[in-house]
């Protein structure tokens, strides 16, 4: 899923659990992808490309069991929950951030082709809805999700505009008929990983900064137990 749309999940988390520091929420919704970028840049996880890249289905997430397997995400979420709920005595924070971490793999399962493993060491079967096999449909679904998160949050018009523009900016990646910079990625998966890293930063900054005046804090609601 486009990085901006993963980032908008933080809007939903903040709406449900307003007492959790938004910086933690923003990092949590992209924790899986941040790890993917690092592991790809170090060659621990593997991405391959077709000789010619015209759209996202010409890029293959061939090996990513540590960042994007279902079991790994469960472990990440559990660790986050233990750290905040048990060690820091913040059970509400722990729950919210565990949900934020888990949201990433749920959204990827809803969009990816079959490239998400069950666990490290288990290469088959792999999971994914197959939506990326129809890239333009995936584009529409992803944008609808991002706008829906904005609508639930009741964000500003500026935030909506940025969500829409960042989605439209990636449109060529979803259609081989629309020219774009995708051809530069052929044979260069590390450039792709770095580009995703940039997209993550841009998406998180956009959501974090443009919604900052509306972020709910624990002061906006009666204080929850353990918060």
Segments from the language model and where they lie:
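N-terminal membrane-targeting hydrophobic helices
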Residues: 1-227
């Amino acid at each position: 899923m486009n990085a901006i749309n993963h980032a908008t999940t933080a809007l939903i988390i903040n709406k449900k659990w307003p007492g959790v520091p938004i910086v933690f929420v923003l990092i949590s919704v992209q924790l899986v992808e941040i790890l993917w970028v690092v592991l790809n840049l170090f060659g621990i996880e593997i991405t391959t490309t077709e000789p010619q890249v015209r759209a996202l289905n010409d890029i293959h997430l061939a090996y990513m069991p540590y960042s994007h397997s279902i079991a790994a995400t469960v472990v990440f979420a559990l660790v986050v929950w233990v750290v905040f709920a048990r060690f820091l005595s913040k059970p509400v924070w722990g729950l919210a951030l565990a949900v934020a971490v888990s949201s990433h793999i749920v959204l990827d399962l809803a969009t990816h082709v079959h490239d998400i493993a069950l666990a490290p060491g288990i290469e088959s079967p792999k999971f994914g809805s197959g939506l990326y096999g129809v890239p333009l449909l995936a584009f529409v679904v992803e944008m609808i999700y991002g706008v829906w998160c904005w609508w639930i949050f009741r964000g500003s018009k500026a935030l909506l505009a940025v969500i829409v523009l960042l989605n439209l900016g990636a449109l060529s990646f979803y259609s081989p008929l629309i020219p774009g910079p995708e051809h530069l990625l052929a044979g260069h998966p590390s450039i792709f990983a770095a580009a995703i890293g940039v997209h993550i930063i841009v998406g998180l900054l956009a959501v974090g900064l443009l919604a900052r005046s509306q972020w709910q804090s624990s002061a906006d609601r009666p204080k929850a137990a353990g918060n």
